[in-house]
Design a protein with these regions (language model features):
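Short, Lys/Arg-enriched N-terminal segments with co-localized hydrophobic residues
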Residues: 1-8
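PLP-dependent amino-acid enzyme catalytic core
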Residues: 8-245
Length: 245
């Protein structure tokens, strides 16, 4: 269903001051030590046959990135969990436009897919008998709820959510504050940028990370960015199969 060309897959920091990193380490770190985002050193060539399910397409598209990962054999199971709800492509009235529905997850946000993928991946990468990892999330609404849902009551993880007080809707505030257990939510007197700055400061603090294992579930995390490719690929493949274009 796919073929891969080229050298071994590594991930580089956008700031260029971190050595190329294997995907497992990039997923666990969330943010590169130099404060940059991890991105693939190259984009592999992938030939994909349209799968019957979104989970199958996700597996086929993501496999080259996980070829040398300890998660390789678990990838079908991870995808089955993360993409267990569909992302249907609906035709709209007019000139052939279509709408990709990404609101069928537990928190009605497109971020549910990647948050669930990341939670499954980090759970499997977590060393046995290790202390809990704290997931730090800055949010303006949707991200925090999706991450909270994905990690809620998941062994070995705590979640800290930061959101700007008075700058989310009442429904979003409820979605951020309703969890309890291993999820703690804090209102920040400031903007989303202030929340993001606090999260990045924590993730870049080596002394703090030595004391408390930290990771990110914001879109700065490779584990959030990469899984989002799947539903676009799935929609494009099926559109081409059905419409021939």
């Amino acid at each position: 269903r796919h073929r891969q060309r080229g050298a071994r897959m590594k991930f580089a920091s956008t700031r260029g001051r971190t050595p190329p990193t294997p995907i497992d380490a990039a997923l666990v770190a969330g943010l590169a030590p130099d404060g940059g985002l991890y991105v693939p050193e190259r984009i592999p060539v992938v030939d994909v046959v349209p799968g019957d399910t979104l989970a199958q397409t996700a597996h086929d598209v993501l496999t080259p990135y996980f070829a040398e990962s300890s998660l390789r054999d678990a990838l079908p199971s991870i995808c089955a969990h993360a993409y267990s709800f569909d992302a249907p492509l609906r035709p709209m009235t007019g000139d052939g436009d279509h709408l990709l529905e990404l609101f069928h997850g537990p928190t009605a946000a497109f971020k549910d897919y990647a948050a669930r993928f990341l939670a499954e991946a980090l759970s499997r990468l977590r060393p046995r008998n290790a202390g809990p990892t704290t997931i730090v999330v800055a949010t303006s609404g949707d991200t925090g709820a999706a991450v909270a849902s994905a990690f809620h009551r998941r062994d070995g993880f705590n979640v800290v959510i930061l959101y700007p007080e008075g700058r989310v809707s009442p429904r979003q505030a409820h979605g951020l504050e309703c969890w309890g257990d291993n999820v703690r939510t804090f209102r920040v007197q400031g903007t989303f940028d202030d929340c993001q700055r606090l999260a990045k400061q924590a993730l870049s603090d080596e002394a703090l990370r030595h004391e408390i294992p930290l990771s990110s579930a914001n879109s700065i995390s490779l584990g959030r960015l990469l899984p989002q490719v799947a539903y676009y690929a799935h929609a494009a493949l099926h559109f081409r199969r059905e419409r021939g274009q």
